[in-house]
């Protein structure tokens, strides 16, 4: 009868390892209380006796089988032994470490100078490393070409437009009659909002339903010119007969609404139609020298300030003469007079070739020597302060005089505006000194440079 592996006697090495393993394990207390009570303890007693009767080799084998760490250590040792087993130990029998040819060189202290003498050696790759997938090297990046990008953008735009046209042809229009009233109203509102938000197009010089709008505008302006001329003649006749002149006042709202229409701007200032001549008839004084109503002056001058009137229009209409009359006459209101001066300056500036930029404006200069006036002033002061008693007596006698036209206090007449600029007499000590106001010019120059840079950035 052959012995089974479980009943074979343990070897001495197994016994030693078993003793070491048992020494490491913690000692379990005998007669430990169990949760099940005495009955469970009595039932487990025979099993413990049977386990103690088993050989030590069986317990050692079970512990080694249950411990995975021991298996891993054993696997590592076996791998190392397999690698070393391939080396031929016979070739190292004649090796003598004392006969190795090593050059005797003096030891050097490593510093910044001789640190660069250490060579660099690249590690040689093995066949296994060569079999690994090499990292794909990034190629050279192409520079951006604006012209090529524009061409590609145009091609893409053409493709998109073709695709969009194809979709439009394929799509079938939805019948709105099948929709409920709320949906139809919502879609109508959306269409109206889209049309309102679209960029406005030029509506001048086009035809709508076979009607030439330009010709229609010219006819309307010509009719208004004739009516305005007739109204001015009727007011002049009524004024001669002593009746109130009301025809121009009745037509004033229609005239102002026509002058404020932006789509008729070119026709309004056209010298051939010459509507501004009728406006001149409304603004000029009547035969008896009386001025037109204040409402006519204010509304028409406000409308004239918005029109681009040029030299040809001024010559054909003659309205500039009426504006000059309002600037020189004393009868118009101050507000009307200022509006007339503003119109005259705006119309004469391109004729006189003057710029509206105040930084480029040229002022008339004149020299002024205050020394003679100062000498007269000091002489008066000396004559007045000859004696304190005389001055006090003079002041007392002046106060006791009866009130007359000569001894009343009046505000002195001074110039409110100046047209001649005094010539500067400041002498610079050094030619490298900065002139007065240079800091303001530098600040303006920097602000202008920032605006130009911002505009260039927005274009990109």
UniProtKB/Swiss-Prot annotation:
Q: List the biased-composition ranges (Low complexity).
A: 48-60
Please identify the protein, giving its name as recorded: Transcription factor iws1
**Mainly localized where?**
nucleus
Q: What does this protein do?
A: Transcription factor involved in RNA polymerase II transcription regulation. May function in both SPT15/TBP post-recruitment and recruitment steps of transcription.
Which cysteines bridge via disulfide bonds?
A: none
- GO cellular component terms attached to this protein's record: nucleus
Where does the record place the region Disordered? Answer: 1-186
Please tell me the species this chain comes from: Aspergillus fumigatus (strain ATCC MYA-4609 / CBS 101355 / FGSC A1100 / Af293) (Neosartorya fumigata)
State where composition is biased (Acidic residues).
Answer: 64-101
Q: Where in the cell is it found?
A: Nucleus
Q: What is the lineage of its organism?
A: Eukaryota, Fungi, Dikarya, Ascomycota, Pezizomycotina
UniProt similarity note: Belongs to the IWS1 family.
- Which of UniProt's keywords are assigned here? Nucleus, Transcription, Transcription regulation
Q: Where is the composition biased (Basic residues)?
A: 133-147
Q: Which residues form the TFIIS N-terminal domain?
A: 277-354
